[in-house]
A protein has these predicted regions:
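Gly/Ser-rich oxyanion-binding loop with an adjacent helix/lid
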Residues: 95-105
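Glycine-rich ThDP/TPP pyrophosphate-binding loop and its adjacent helix/strand module
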Residues: 90, 104-121, 125, 129-250
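A generic structural signal for short
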Residues: 24-25, 69, 97-99, 154-155, ...
Length: 250
């Protein structure tokens, strides 16, 4: 019986310097980083790319990626990206932020950047918790979600307010050109996310205005589930509030 020929279908992106990182097993953020790096290579923009990184678990990434990175203070990445893109308009600029950084701490920054039609791409890694500081509730935590600060009851609207659907909000802003939402919990979701992220990047490359992609990422540590259970957790808890779709396009 002959042995079937094995084909390599995926390899480490050239822009990824090391596969070692300090994030938890089962975290979805390294998967999102891989998709981003693959696209930067495929679009041949890595040499002129500037990533503006927020504060979160993903702040561990700048040391393992072969692109220029600016480190911003909590929530301020869109303002830093605005300055970088205006001073260096030929550069490809994107922000990398979590929900705590972008939506809880820097909501005004992202809204005003979209309203001005700033010509960079904002990428949100949304896992519904402040992962780096111990798993506290953020503005995107869904109703009923147990976090370090909503452990007994889960998030209750009457006490904690409703989650902010930032992609839906930005889609209503006149200055935004492209807004979409993806996820990292299944192969099909990853393929979808690569597609929409590529479209968002092309919007910037074509000078069409502000582009935004929200990516739902897994956090087994602060969801209190095993890594293998996180895909089902997203379907049960996030899908109703944050459906995967394109909300706005040119």
């Amino acid at each position: 019986m002959s042995t079937p020929e094995l084909k390599k279908v995926s390899a480490k992106p050239d822009l990824l310097l090391s596969t070692h990182h300090s994030l938890c097993p089962g975290c979805g953020e390294p998967l999102a980083l891989r998709v981003i790096l693959e696209l930067l290579g495929e679009l041949d923009v890595a040499e002129r790319t500037i990533c503006v990184c927020g504060i979160g678990c993903y702040t561990a990434f700048p040391g393992i990626i072969d692109i220029d990175v600016l480190q911003a203070l909590h929530g301020r990445a869109p303002s830093v990206a605005t300055g970088a893109k205006r001073v260096l308009p030929d550069r490809f600029v994107f922000t990398l932020q979590g929900d705590g950084d972008m939506v809880s701490e820097g909501l005004q920054e992202i809204i005003h950047s979209a309203a001005r039609g700033e010509r960079f791409t904002a990428v949100l890694l949304n896992n519904g918790v402040f992962g780096e500081t111990g798993g506290h509730m953020t503005t995107t935590s869904v109703l009923g979600q147990r976090t370090k600060t909503t452990m007994d009851t889960g998030r209750i609207a009457e006490k904690h307010g409703y989650p902010i659907k930032i992609a839906d909000l930005l889609a209503q802003v006149d200055g935004s050109a492209y807004v979409a939402r993806g996820a990292m919990h299944t192969p099909s979701a990853i393929a979808w996310t690569k597609r929409i992220l590529g479209e968002a990047f092309r919007v910037q490359l074509e000078g069409q205005g502000f582009s935004f992609v929200e990516i739902l990422t897994m956090c087994p540590t602060d969801w209190y589930v095993e890594p293998a259970e996180t895909p089902d957790w997203i379907e049960r808890n996030f899908a109703g509030t944050y459906p995967l779709k394109i909300l706005k396009h040119p």
